[in-house]
């Protein structure tokens, strides 16, 4: 059975009076006022959850960090619906934090370059429902949780940052906008020291508290303060997005347009008659006016009115929609990629000049990506012209074929087209026979060369990854500061073992409240004291420089807590009675409550030595002898929190 402290881990929403807590089958969202359950997020194995974190901007979303390296974002106000599934490659998560950072920069009159992208038409995308292909506005991949929110009063662009620590604590992953990962190597962290708490001091500034009492600072400030660096990051993310945007629509052309049309032609012409025989007999019909019995039978029984309309519809869709996609998707995307690559190259060159003594950027991959983008644009324009010619041939063929079909079906049919009016009709018709009535004619390349496009776009994707790895990541890593670990408590307790139990930043205050367990190392002359093992201290630190604000207070543990596991004690910043009620709601087995006010012996005559005496609230489960215990509010500099203790497991 999992520890009760994990079962009743409560995390309050920063904006709404709701909280998230673990239940047997996942996470549940409750309203604080009446404890009504608002949503349930099912999770098959709750032990795979590393931790979870609220959206601090709108309060609508919850990020759940899983130990397998995935992050799931759920919309709490839509029944906990999954809106995004993120995967960080080669990472096993131990703990993570989600930060939404508004990007605010003062307008600079010296910026002479206007943003050409703003003057380009908005991107669109093609989708297919059960009936037809439609055009809809394009939305970014993570727009469901990153897009503009009508309830968000801050209209500034935001940089979403998921900071993830891996299980070995030797690597930190900074995941930008749910799409772009930058890995930071941390060589000075001992693997056996687990990360206990990540505290956000301010936007992009975090204090990471480890079990041994050491603290490490992660600071994204230099990155956020450099508009050019943020632009560099945005450019590479947009280039990656646009490449995926084109690849998605290329597969759409192949799946929804080219393949259905060419498969139909293959079944109707090759499998039902044979390409070679059909081509020669259609040529004889056109040049000599002769029609064989087999051809007439094929026209009447295999083609017929229904298949004729189907053939014409699929062909028109294949040619016309492909031209539309190339014109409205590929051309704008190529133009944007070329512009963004030029912008990216300019920033990298500027950084290279600025830091020429220590860093020189190799822009070979950038040049290759630029040339590939230009090549793709040229190939797209040529394909549009070629498809226009093919569509003309297709239309002429069906004008002639319509008369031939209805002649076979109806002896009294009157011809509707006189091809003598078109001097090139005969040549165009025979050219179409050569083009479509052959094995080569029903390959995907007969519409557009999908393989050629796919190979070129994939090579562009490889170049983008190369640029990200060789040029962008190295620059971003230089602008993210990971300080060496600081041993905050070593000087104060030089001969003791420190075990940090918890640390929290109280809202609207610039200090951190910590809870530590201090175990003194007994000398040979000094007898072992059980009291030394269970000495808890509560104190405060400045959030930025970790300076000690006031003398810490020792926690006098009530006798009722002797059998509770102090090493798992943590803060719960809420009302104690609410916590007990939460426990009761979360698990109906917890049905009995004992409240005992603890007061030390001779309490009224006792001098104030800085020790905190705490009342105890205990919740027990009679069926399996598991307990949850929590203290009353512990006041620290005018603010308060509660402590929670899980029961020690009894050895059988």
From Swiss-Prot:
InterPro entries: APC4 (IPR024789), APC4_long_dom (IPR024790). Pathway: Protein modification; protein ubiquitination. This is Anaphase-promoting complex subunit 4. The keyword Transferase does not apply. Present with 1332 molecules/cell in log phase SD medium. GO terms for biological process: anaphase-promoting complex-dependent catabolic process; cell division; protein K11-linked ubiquitination; protein ubiquitination; regulation of meiotic cell cycle; regulation of mitotic cell cycle. It comes from the Eukaryota. Keywords: Cell cycle, Cell division, Cytoplasm, Mitosis, Nucleus, Ubl conjugation pathway.
């Amino acid at each position: 059975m999992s520890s009760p402290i994990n079962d009743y881990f409560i995390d309050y929403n920063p904006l709404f009076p709701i909280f998230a807590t673990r239940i047997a089958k996942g996470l549940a969202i409750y309203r604080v006022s009446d404890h009504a359950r608002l949503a349930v997020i099912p999770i098959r194995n709750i032990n795979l959850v590393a931790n979870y974190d609220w959206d601090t901007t709108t309060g609508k979303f919850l990020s759940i960090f899983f130990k397998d390296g995935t992050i799931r974002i759920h919309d709490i106000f839509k029944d906990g619906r999954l809106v995004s599934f993120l995967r960080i490659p080669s990472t096993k998560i131990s703990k993570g934090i989600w930060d939404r950072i508004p990007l605010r920069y003062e307008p600079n009159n010296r910026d002479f370059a206007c943003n050409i992208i703003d003057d380009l038409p908005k991107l669109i995308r093609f989708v297919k429902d059960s009936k037809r292909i439609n055009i809809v506005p394009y939305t970014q991949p993570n727009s469901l949780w990153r897009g503009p929110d009508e309830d968000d009063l801050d209209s500034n662009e935001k940089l979403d940052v998921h900071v993830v620590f891996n299980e070995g604590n030797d690597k930190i992953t900074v995941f930008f906008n749910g799409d772009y990962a930058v890995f930071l190597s941390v060589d000075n962290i001992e693997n056996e020291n687990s990360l206990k708490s990540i505290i956000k001091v301010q936007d992009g500034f975090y204090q990471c508290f480890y079990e041994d009492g050491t603290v490490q600072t992660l600071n994204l400030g230099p990155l956020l303060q450099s508009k050019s660096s943020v632009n560099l990051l945005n450019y590479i993310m947009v280039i990656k997005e646009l490449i995926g945007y084109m690849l998605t629509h290329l597969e759409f052309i192949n799946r929804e347009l080219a393949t259905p049309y060419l498969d139909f032609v293959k079944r109707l012409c090759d499998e039902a008659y044979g390409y070679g025989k059909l081509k020669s007999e259609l040529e004889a019909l056109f040049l000599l006016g002769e029609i064989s019995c087999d051809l007439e039978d094929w026209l009447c029984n295999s083609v017929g009115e229904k298949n004729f309309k189907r053939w014409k519809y699929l062909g028109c869709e294949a040619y016309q929609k492909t031209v539309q996609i190339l014109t409205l998707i590929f051309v704008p995307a190529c133009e944007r990629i070329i512009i963004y690559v030029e912008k990216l190259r300019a920033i990298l060159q500027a950084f290279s000049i600025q830091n020429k003594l220590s860093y020189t950027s190799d822009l070979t991959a950038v040049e290759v990506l630029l040339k590939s983008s230009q090549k793709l644009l040229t190939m797209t324009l040529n394909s549009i012209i070629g498809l226009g010619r093919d569509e003309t041939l297709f239309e002429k063929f069906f004008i002639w074929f319509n008369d031939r079909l209805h002649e076979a079906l109806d002896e009294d049919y009157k011809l509707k087209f006189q091809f003598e009016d078109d001097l090139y009709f005969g040549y165009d018709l025979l050219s179409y026979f050569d083009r479509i009535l052959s094995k080569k004619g029903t390959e995907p390349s007969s519409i557009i060369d999908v393989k050629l496009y796919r190979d070129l776009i994939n090579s562009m994707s490889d170049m983008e990854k190369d640029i990200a790895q060789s040029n962008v990541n190295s620059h971003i890593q230089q602008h993210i500061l990971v300080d060496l670990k600081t041993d905050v408590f070593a000087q104060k307790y030089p001969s003791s073992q420190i075990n940090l139990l918890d640390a929290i930043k109280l809202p609207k205050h610039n200090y951190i409240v910590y809870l530590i367990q201090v175990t003194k190392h007994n000398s040979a002359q000094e007898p072992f004291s059980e009291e030394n093992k269970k000495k808890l201290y509560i104190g405060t630190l400045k959030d930025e420089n970790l300076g000690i604000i006031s003398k810490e207070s020792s926690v006098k543990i009530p006798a009722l807590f002797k059998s509770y596991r102090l090493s798992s004690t943590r803060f719960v910043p809420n009302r104690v009675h609410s916590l007990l009620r939460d426990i009761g709601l979360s698990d109906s087995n917890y049905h009995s409550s004992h409240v005992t006010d603890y007061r030390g012996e001779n309490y009224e005559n006792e001098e104030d030595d800085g020790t905190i005496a705490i009342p105890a609230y205990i919740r027990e489960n009679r069926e399996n002898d598991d307990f949850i215990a929590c203290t009353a509010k512990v006041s620290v500099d005018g603010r308060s929190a509660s402590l929670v203790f899980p029961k020690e497991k009894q050895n059988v």
